[in-house]
């Protein structure tokens, strides 16, 4: 709760938000960075992926994302772009986009945030239904002998 003295004085503390940085580099610098400089900041698995080259499919997705951002009205979210590319690595250019990531059954809408840089799209669209464990069945353990049968 607020202190009564502060409330009486009418002083409102301005909220400060943490400025995002990826490996010590702020977001504006990341957006202006060349691909070669950006790759140096990524972990080894992703550096290897970029060193082996981007194929046609990821480039087509980035092209569609650019188009959706351009066509979106100012201050609005861009239209969702659907994709099956779960192995696509999130780069700074994709921030602010909405992507429908296929999980094998449906397209889960994911809004790309700065904290997602360097992760795969698949990490944000779960492809399985987590197990909800029920009661143990007959023969599960010795103690289950005393559970009455239905």
UniProtKB/Swiss-Prot annotation:
Listed InterPro entries: Ribosomal_uS19 (IPR002222), Ribosomal_uS19_CS (IPR020934), Ribosomal_uS19_euk/arc (IPR005713), Ribosomal_uS19_SF (IPR023575)
Localization of this protein: Cytoplasm
Gene Ontology molecular function: any one: RNA binding
Highest taxon listed in the record's lineage: Eukaryota
UniProt keyword Metal-binding present: no
One GO cellular component term: cytosolic small ribosomal subunit
Any single Pfam family the record assigns to this protein: Ribosomal_S19
Keywords recorded for this protein, A-Z: Cytoplasm, Ribonucleoprotein, Ribosomal protein
One GO BP: translation
PANTHER family referenced in this protein's UniProt entry, alphabetically: RIBOSOMAL PROTEIN S19P FAMILY MEMBER, SMALL RIBOSOMAL SUBUNIT PROTEIN US19Y
Family from the record: Belongs to the universal ribosomal protein uS19 family.
HAMAP family: Ribosomal_uS19
Protein name in UniProt: Small ribosomal subunit protein uS19y
Provenance organism: Arabidopsis thaliana (Mouse-ear cress)
């Amino acid at each position: 709760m607020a202190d009564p003295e502060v409330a009486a004085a009418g002083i409102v503390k301005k909220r400060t938000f943490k400025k995002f940085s990826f490996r010590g580099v702020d977001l504006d610098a990341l957006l202006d960075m060349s691909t070669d400089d950006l790759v140096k900041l990524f972990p080894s698995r992703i550096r290897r992926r970029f060193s082996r080259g981007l194929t046609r499919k990821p480039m087509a997705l980035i092209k569609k994302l650019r188009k959706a951002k351009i066509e979106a009205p100012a201050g609005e979210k861009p239209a969702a772009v659907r994709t099956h590319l779960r192995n696509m690595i999130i780069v700074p250019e994709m921030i602010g986009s909405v992507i429908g990531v296929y999980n094998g059954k449906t397209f889960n809408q994911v809004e790309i945030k700065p904290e997602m840089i360097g992760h795969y799209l698949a990490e944000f669209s779960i492809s399985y239904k987590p197990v909800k464990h029920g009661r143990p069945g007959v023969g599960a353990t010795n103690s289950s002998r005393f559970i009455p049968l239905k």
